[in-house]
Amino acid sequence: MTPLIQIRQGVARHPLYRLRAPFDFTLHAGEHTVLFGKNGAGKTLLARQIAGACPLLGEARTDNLASEQRTQGGIRCLSFRDIYGGNEPAYYQQRWNRADEQVFPTVAEMLERAKPVGEEVSEETLRRVEETGITAHLDKTINLLSSGELRRLQTARMLFSRPKVLMIDTPFIGLDREARRSFTALLEELSKDLTLILIVCREADIPPFIRKVVSLSERTLTHTESREEFFQRRENEQKTLTPKPAPLPLPPTASPVPQGENMIEFCDVTVTYGSRHILHHLDWTVRCGERWALTGPNGAGKSTLLSLICADNPQGYACPIHLFGKRRGRGESIWEIKKHIGFVSPEMFSTYRKPLPAIDIAASGLRDTIGLYVRPSQQEREFCLEWMERFGAGDLATRDYLSLSDGEQRLVLLVRAFVKQPALLILDEPFHGLDDELTNRARSIIDAYMARPDRTLIMVSHYDEELPSCIDHRLTLSRQD
């Protein structure tokens, strides 16, 4: 059988995009494959070369699939970044403006834009799009879609190009338990008609229908093996692992704690967009020193609730909300609120696109800016570097942030939330895109940080096993559909 993709001793033409050694890669129709490795292992580099985005030297490639990139039936790549504002940093706060709702397209409009110009869409393609389930939401504007619904919309749009190979980066990121199950079922259904390549950094994210795993480590393709061989090897490696050194001890805290026992008070808070209630008559109090897990399905309003606390949502001025002992809308600036908060979220990752050294991205957390507008002192830079080393990101400090892998960028933004040692730590899915090792390390740092009695935590996660052991309260939201 002629393979769809055949690469022998592949080397990227541009030195910046090369793996450390030439690689071999073969893909046959229906041979659904996972590219697996830790953050920074080289998964994205390999994926770009497989997809033809990075030309190879010589005659390493013997198939013609990459040349079909701009035609029907080639390789298509799907990465689930936020699609609300095209990754524009200015849109980070504008997303929450109710008046902006009119600028968002509907699902039907987004699907129509994805159709090939001047060509009739085949019945087979329409069937595939129908299988995504997104056609049940044609009249919704995309800002009202849950993460799982957005995932289905982006997948459906890609199907109009009738790919032979669909490559998906971190397919389950940001999805709740039910959405993960549902999206896995969708991928399995799609696998009957096209060939899938999934890029993952966690073993738990390898779907049951995947039969082949390609592993990378330190920018080198190390193993190509069956699913069974992969899990057996990983089990054997776990038995011989050398314990990692403990993270650096935490520095003494110097950031002030706002006066008053209650950090946050919501009294009968309701938030609506159009005719839909996002939050409905919510009463909630967070006291100093409490550690909260904020849970609920995609679309339940968790990110909206956090936007009210972080002073990003203008509806906060009209709601009966007290932050750090003061009623919102009584003349305080958003910076007076933000100075007490360390924050990271998927939306921040999507919109923080600054070409700066990673240490400057981390240091921007000292002054709550998206970008670095005040040069940190040498002492501040050294302090930020200590925090990067604490999270295992010290070797990223001088690298251009935009040259890092998605997982490495997310790690730098997590460091950014800690550098000013805030009184209130708000972590919205902080382990998005992090491998198991970095997740465990970060969780232990959170526990150590929250051992201080005057620090408060609110953390969102769709994985209960990710929650740190310090969690002592839980607020569960439900969708108001």
Language-model regions, residue ranges each:
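ABC ATPase nucleotide-binding domain signature region
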Residues: 47-116, 306-370
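Hydrophobic anchor residue at the start of the ABC signature
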Residues: 154-155, 414
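Conserved beta-strand-loop-alpha-helix hinge in the C-terminal portion
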Residues: 208, 216-244, 468-469, 473-481
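Conserved ABC ATPase "signature" region
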Residues: 120-137, 363, 378-396
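Conserved ABC ATPase signature
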Residues: 141-145, 149, 373-376, 400-404, ...
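Walker B catalytic motif
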Residues: 141, 170-171, 176, 400, ...
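The feature captures the beta-strand-to-loop junction immediately N-terminal to the Walker
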Residues: 36-38, 295-297
